[in-house]
């Protein structure tokens, strides 16, 4: 984000709006987060070092944050297993702690949080772990809203993310109650007894 001038970011935001799209920006420090929000960026990705002031800027602008807490934990596991240089382990541990503090600030500030992971390659196996990491700070209901209704809002797709007349009937039927234990969604699909896509079952396990 910081390598772009205000005029460049504004031009990207305006051009995206003309195409009915939006701009997302990878931001870590508070100054970048606040600047992106004030310039019209719709989603702030990561926001690892967010503070109260930058959170207020995001809220005032009506922007969203996608915390991606799992990427740091997954990389930390890799470092501890010797798959990354040893010097990275301490740094990742520090960033992991900070990401949870940031999530607390976001939650307390009432920001609209999307759900994403930023995982690539072999780290894809950690995708659903985001649910249980965010449980350390957020309620199950808030996490579910992030993964459904808020993500649909971010994408400007009003027919997604909700179960109501006029919406796409894209529904997961879970063996368990995610409001009681969000961990049922972190089992790599093993807890899914049925999957419905546009009103048609594509998986059904009676």
Language-model segments: residues:
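Histidine/acidic residue-rich metal-binding segments in metalloenzymes
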Residues: 1-65, 79-83, 92-113
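His/Asp/Glu-enriched, well-ordered alpha-helical/loop segment
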Residues: 18, 84-87, 95-178, 194
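Active-site beta-loop-alpha junctions enriched in small/polar residues
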Residues: 28-30, 49, 68-72, 118-122
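Short, charged, surface-exposed secondary-structure boundary motifs
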Residues: 52-59, 75-79, 143, 183, ...
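Short, Lys/Arg- and Gly-enriched loop/turn segments at beta-strand edges
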Residues: 178-184
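Short, compositionally biased
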Residues: 184-193
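Glycine-centered positions in the ABC transporter ATPase nucleotide-binding domain
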Residues: 198-199
């Amino acid at each position: 984000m910081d390598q772009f001038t205000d005029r460049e970011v504004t031009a990207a935001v305006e051009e995206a709006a003309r195409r009915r799209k939006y701009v997302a920006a990878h931001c870590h420090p508070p100054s970048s987060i606040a600047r992106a929000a004030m310039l019209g960026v719709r989603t702030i990705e990561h926001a690892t070092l967010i503070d109260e002031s930058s959170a207020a800027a995001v809220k005032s602008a009506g922007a969203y944050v996608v915390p991606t807490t799992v990427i740091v934990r997954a990389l930390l596991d890799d470092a501890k297993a010797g798959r990354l240089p040893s010097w990275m382990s301490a740094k990742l541990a520090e960033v992991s702690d900070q990401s949870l503090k940031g999530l607390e600030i976001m939650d307390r500030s009432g920001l609209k949080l999307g759900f994403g992971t930023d995982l690539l390659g072999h780290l894809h196996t950690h995708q659903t772990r985001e649910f249980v990491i965010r449980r350390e700070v957020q309620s199950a209901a808030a996490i579910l809203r992030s993964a459904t209704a808020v993500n649909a809002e971010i994408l400007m797709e009003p027919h997604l993310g909700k179960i109501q007349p006029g919406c796409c009937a894209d529904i997961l039927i879970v063996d368990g109650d995610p409001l009681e234990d969000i961990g049922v969604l972190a089992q790599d699909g093993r807890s899914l007894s049925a999957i419905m896509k546009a009103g048609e079952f594509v998986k059904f396990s009676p």
